[in-house]
UniProtKB/Swiss-Prot annotation:
Name this polypeptide is given: Large ribosomal subunit protein bL35
Cross-referenced InterPro entries: Ribosomal_bL35 (IPR001706), Ribosomal_bL35-like (IPR021137), Ribosomal_bL35_CS (IPR018265), Ribosomal_bL35_sf (IPR037229)
HAMAP family, sorted: Ribosomal_bL35
Keyword NADP part of the UniProt annotation: no
One cellular-component annotation, GO: cytosolic large ribosomal subunit
UniProt-listed GO biological process terms: translation
Record PANTHER family: 54S RIBOSOMAL PROTEIN BL35M, LARGE RIBOSOMAL SUBUNIT PROTEIN BL35M
Alphabetized Pfam families for the sequence: Ribosomal_L35p (PF01632)
Length: 64
């Protein structure tokens, strides 16, 4: 039986923390940034954690 592969899109978008939580980046910080407030852009810069309701789905994609 062949090895199960990690989802290519998921491995580019998510990262694990030392405690096993899953980090993600915020959306809406790619283009048309002149229309967005400085406060909003600063808030979107920082990484966030994946919500617990989505965690199991992401773990399946990452094969954790």
């Amino acid at each position: 039986m062949p090895k199960v592969k990690t989802h290519s899109g998921a491995k580019k978008r998510f990262a694990l923390t030392a405690k096993g939580k899953i980090k993600r980046k915020h959306a809406f910080k790619n283009h048309m940034l002149d229309k967005k407030q400085t406060k909003q852009k600063r808030r979107l810069t920082h990484t966030a954690l994946v919500h617990k309701s989505d965690k199991s789905r992401i773990e399946k994609l990452l094969r954790i």
